[in-house]
Structure formats: C-alpha cells, structure tokens
C-alpha cells in the first residue's frame, strides 16, 4: 500500500507537467510574436551593417552590373514596404526614395521600412497571419501565400542581401558588425 501511494505520487509528479506544459507552451508560442521577434532582431542586425560602410563608400559595387552598397540598403527597404503592404494593414507605408545617395536618407529609409513592418506585424493575430495575403506579380512563381509566409519570405530575402553586404564590407576592409570582437 505504501509503495502504491508512492508510485501514485511519482506518476502525478511526472505526468502533471506533461499535461500542463502543452497548454502553457501554446500560450507562450505565437506565430505573430515569433515573427515579430525575428523581425526586430533582423532590424537591429541590418541597421548595424547598413551603418558600417563609410559614407564615401556607399557607392561601392564589386562589379558593374551589381547594385552599390546604398542601393542594396534601399532595395531591402523597398522590398520590406512592398511585401508588408500585402498584409492588409491600416498602417501608412513610408515612401522610399530609390535614388537617395545620402547616408542619412538611406539609413532613415531602412529604419522606416522596418518600423512600418513592425507596426504591420503588431496589427496581426495568429489567425490573420494564416489568412491569404494580397496577390502580387510574384505569386506566379511562389503561388498564393499566407501573411505569415510573406513575412518569412521578405526576411529570407533580406538575409540574402545581408550576405552580399558582408562581402561588400570585407572587400572594403571593414569587418561586419556581427563579426567584430571586443
């Protein structure tokens, strides 16, 4: 009898967390919150790398057909705005001057695009993130997308451009912020 009670208590101690944990995990995990956390991290990383290139080198490009460093930043800003508009938010999108050459204007465009994205993501719920996004000409190769997929896609696109920016910095003798050591 003593062993049966001990066994019952042991089972209770071991099984109860398993019964409660999924419910707690569901409360803690959220599509919208996960995407917002990733978006915020990406903004911080991109603002640092964008500012890392000396102003007199913003026009640098490794080969003639490529975008220069400043254009890469503006390309990210424009893509952020264009893709986030697909999430049907009431937020007013910033206007990106794709011909900007001033460091201050370029960095402001990038920051504004991420701030716009932050507001758009915050306006979503897990349910709206699973709804279809507005269609664009890009759907011909990607197919219809959920709003969550659009956010994921634009972040993937940004990481691609980030990788190119790392090379631009290194070709100019600049260590990317993420690689710097104290």
Predicted regions and their residues:
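N-terminal secretory signal peptides that target proteins for export/translocation
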Residues: 1-7
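Bacterial N-terminal signal peptides
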Residues: 9-23
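Well-ordered alpha-helical scaffold segments within catalytic/enzyme domains
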Residues: 45, 49-50, 84, 116, ...
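Boundary at the C-terminal end of the N-terminal hydrophobic targeting segment
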Residues: 25-28
């Amino acid at each position: 009898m003593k062993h049966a009670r001990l066994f019952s208590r042991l089972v209770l101690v071991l099984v109860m967390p398993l019964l409660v944990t999924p419910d707690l995990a569901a409360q803690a995990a959220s599509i919208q919150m996960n995407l917002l956390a990733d978006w915020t991290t990406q903004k911080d990383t991109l603002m640092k790398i964008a500012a890392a290139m000396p102003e007199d080198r913003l026009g640098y490009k490794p080969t003639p057909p490529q975008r220069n460093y400043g254009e890469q930043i503006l390309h990210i800003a424009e893509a952020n705005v264009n893709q986030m508009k697909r999430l049907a938010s009431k937020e007013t999108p910033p206007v990106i001057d794709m011909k900007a050459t001033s460091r201050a204007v370029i960095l402001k465009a990038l920051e504004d695009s991420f701030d716009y994205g932050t507001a758009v993501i915050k306006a979503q719920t897990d349910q709206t993130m699973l709804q279809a996004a507005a269609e664009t000409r890009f759907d011909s190769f990607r197919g219809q997308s959920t709003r969550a997929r659009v956010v994921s896609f634009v972040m993937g696109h940004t990481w691609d451009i980030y990788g190119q920016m790392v090379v631009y910095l290194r070709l100019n003798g600049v260590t990317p912020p993420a690689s710097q050591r104290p």
